[in-house]
């Protein structure tokens, strides 16, 4: 069994979040928020900012990211943990894609959940139970990010 640690950013542009379609490898064709593995000697928040820049060409300071939640899920090789942060960018910000992705879009959090994470839709498409469990976990943390974003800072 292995232990995997990654960090991801729910990046807000106004009321929309950035999602990116994977080109190949892990979950090819899936739509995800930017993120990736925490490198040796790197703090998770630094990884989140680095991955956002590498995957989308958008620079944010690690200090500008807010911790939201930790998502844990089984990978077949062990348990993976992804630390989720909220971030924001200017309304005119555009994302670029790297070789890991073939497309990106900005959409509301609820539209993302309904379009890509809906359990009934995934079951109809024959998704495995582990894929459905992961989608439910992603939907949970996206909702937590939306809730935290609208809450007063003193309650976050």
Tell where the protein language model's regions lie, with residue ranges:
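A short coil-to-beta-strand element that immediately follows conserved catalytic motifs
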Residues: 59-69
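Active-site-adjacent beta-strand/loop module that shapes the phosphate/pyrophosphate-binding cleft
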Residues: 71-94, 105, 109-110, 134-145
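Short connector loops at helix/strand junctions that flank enzyme active sites
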Residues: 4, 12, 33, 78-82
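Conserved N-terminal beta-strand and adjoining loop/helix that marks the start
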Residues: 1-18
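Structural detector for helix-capping/boundary residues
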Residues: 36, 50, 63, 107-110
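Conserved beta-strand segments that form the floor/walls of ligand-binding pockets within enzyme
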Residues: 32, 66, 84
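Conserved Nudix-box catalytic region and its N-terminal flanking loop in Nudix hydrolases
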Residues: 16-54
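Nudix hydrolase/Nudix homology domain
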Residues: 28-30, 99-156
């Amino acid at each position: 069994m292995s232990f995997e640690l990654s960090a991801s950013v729910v990046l807000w542009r106004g009321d929309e979040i950035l999602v990116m379609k994977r080109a190949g490898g892990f979950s090819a064709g899936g739509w995800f928020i930017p993120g990736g593995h925490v490198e040796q000697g790197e703090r998770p928040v630094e990884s989140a900012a680095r991955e956002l820049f590498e995957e989308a060409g958008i620079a944010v300071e690690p200090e500008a990211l807010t911790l939201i939640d930790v998502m844990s899920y089984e990978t077949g090789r062990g348990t993976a943990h992804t630390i989720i942060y909220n971030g924001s960018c200017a309304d005119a910000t555009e994302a670029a894609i790297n070789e890991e992705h073939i497309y990106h879009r900005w959409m509301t959090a609820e539209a993302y959940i309904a379009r890509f994470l809906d359990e009934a839709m995934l079951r109809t498409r024959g998704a495995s139970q582990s894929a459905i469990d992961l989608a439910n976990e992603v939907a949970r943390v996206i909702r937590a990010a939306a809730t935290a974003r609208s809450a007063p800072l003193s309650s976050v």
